């Protein structure tokens, strides 16, 4: 595997930009809220979504549910790995795919779970933290 330079990465992102935005919009719409008392269904769908994205680029993945210290079911997590070369360094990528509840939707100018572009920025719950990195 050959290392990519900054210009090559920039070119690839620019050529794939509309797909990246589409993926981010899909991620925002999943409403992957992680909070006590909220069903984990959205989190499971979000984890599966992230796992599917990783599989598309050749990463072996599995979706697992963690357990809280008290033994109750915890968050849904994605574990992935890809061995490109035995002599390549190990690289760890970490991101969270959940969002926190929206305390007061009335303070939002847009629907928090619909990606909305305003002046070249995309707004939506989790768009920057960490949805953008996932997309």
Could you describe each region identified by the protein language model?
Residues 128-135:
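Active-site alpha-helical elements of protease catalytic centers
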Residues 2-127:
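Acidic/His- and Gly-rich active-site-bordering loop/insert found
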